[in-house]
């Protein structure tokens, strides 16, 4: 195996290795019997951090290796540019679009809920005001 193909394999294996390390660390933390709730909270936060880092490593590695030129360069191969670049870019854009949609949906739902609450809240005080400025005779 050449240095170039070693680099490709090393980068490709990073998410799996990171996942394994994260799982082992999380399993070890879960076996600890710690009475302090603040320490347990910090350890849970650390476990969540490990999960997020694994997900980021997976996405970053996938985004890197999906590019034909990068993958070919890491393997030490030559690549005919053209259709492969276009196809890879389309796949990358689809992936980014899917990720953005997943991020936008919860925010869109929250905006709709807040908007509905504001309309209801605005209607109630106006109805309660009655006639302002009229002196009872």
Swiss-Prot record:
It comes from the Viruses. The keyword rRNA processing does not apply. It is found in: Host mitochondrion. Keywords: Host mitochondrion, Host-virus interaction, Inhibition of host innate immune response by virus, RNA-binding, Suppressor of RNA silencing, Viral immunoevasion. GO terms for biological process: symbiont-mediated suppression of host innate immune response. Transmembrane segments: none annotated. Residues 1-79 are annotated as: RNA-binding. Encoded on a subgenomic RNA (RNA3) synthesized during replication and which is co-terminal with RNA1. Homodimer. Interacts with RNA-directed RNA polymerase. Binds double-strand RNA (dsRNA) with high affinity. Suppresses the host RNA silencing-based antiviral response. Belongs to the nodaviridae B2 protein family. This is Protein B2.
């Amino acid at each position: 195996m050449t240095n170039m193909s070693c680099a490709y394999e090393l980068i490709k294996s990073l998410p799996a290795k990171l996942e394994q390390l994260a799982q082992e660390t999380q399993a070890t933390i879960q076996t600890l019997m710690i009475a302090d709730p603040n320490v347990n909270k910090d350890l849970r936060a650390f476990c969540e951090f490990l999960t997020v880092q694994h997900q980021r490593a997976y996405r970053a590695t996938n985004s890197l290796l999906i590019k034909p030129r990068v993958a070919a360069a890491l393997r030490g191969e030559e690549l005919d540019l053209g259709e492969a670049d276009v196809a890879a870019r389309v796949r990358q854009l689809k992936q980014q679009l899917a990720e953005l949609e997943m991020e936008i949906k919860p925010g869109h739902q929250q905006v709709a809920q807040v908007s509905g609450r504001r309309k209801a809240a605005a209607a109630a005080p106006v109805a309660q005001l009655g006639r302002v400025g009229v002196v009872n005779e």
